[in-house]
Structure formats: structure tokens, C-alpha cells
């Protein structure tokens, strides 16, 4: 856990609950706006999509890039964050 970003460490420190999507590591302000505009305003909704994709990081990353304009780096960070959260809490 030493090489984790502070944002990732904070996200993994507790259940998702009602956290806004901007709490997810990898979600920039601009990407959060794009997600919220299309109805994904909570972290648990984004996690739900990740789970619907069977935790397939490559597929999830393509979805973020194609549908919401995420950069490759944002998509990778976000999928890694959700994968790590699943490992801790599911």
C-alpha cells in the first residue's frame, strides 16, 4: 500500500457508500462532468458498470474512453482503482 496515491488510499479505506464519482482515483474534474452529465454521478454506479463488464479492465477502459472522453491514463487509473476496491471489499 506504500506506492499508492493518496487518493487511491483514501478511496480504498472504506466502503463506497454514497461517494460522488469524483472520489474514484483517475477521475479528473472534466471526466467527472462528462460522467455526471450522462447520469453516472455516484461511485457505486461506476462500480456497477465495472461489475457488469465482469471486471474486465480493458473493456471498461475502452468504454470510459469511447463514451466519456477519458484519456488512456484516466481509464487505466480508474479501472485499477475499482479492481483494487473489489479485492478489498468483495
From Swiss-Prot:
Domain of life: Eukaryota
UniProt-listed InterPro entries: BAF (IPR051387), BAF_prot (IPR004122), BAF_sf (IPR036617)
GO biological process: chromosome organization
Keywords, ordered alphabetically: Cytoplasm, Nucleus
One Pfam family named in its UniProt record: SAM_BAF
One Gene Ontology CC term in the entry: condensed chromosome
Record-level Gene Ontology MF annotations: DNA binding; identical protein binding
Keyword Disulfide bond in record: no
Chief place of localization: nucleus
Annotated localization: Nucleus; Cytoplasm
Tissue note: Expressed strongly in testis and pancreas. Also detected in brain, colon, liver, lung, ovary, placenta, prostate, small intestine, spleen and thymus. Not detected in heart, kidney and skeletal muscle.
Statement: the UniProt record of this protein carries the keyword GTP-binding: no
Family indicated by similarity: Belongs to the BAF family.
Function: May play a role in BANF1 regulation and influence tissue-specific roles of BANF1.
Record text on subunit structure and interactions: Homodimer. Heterodimerizes with BANF1.
Name the UniProt record assigns to this protein: Barrier-to-autointegration factor-like protein
Gene it is expressed from: BANF2
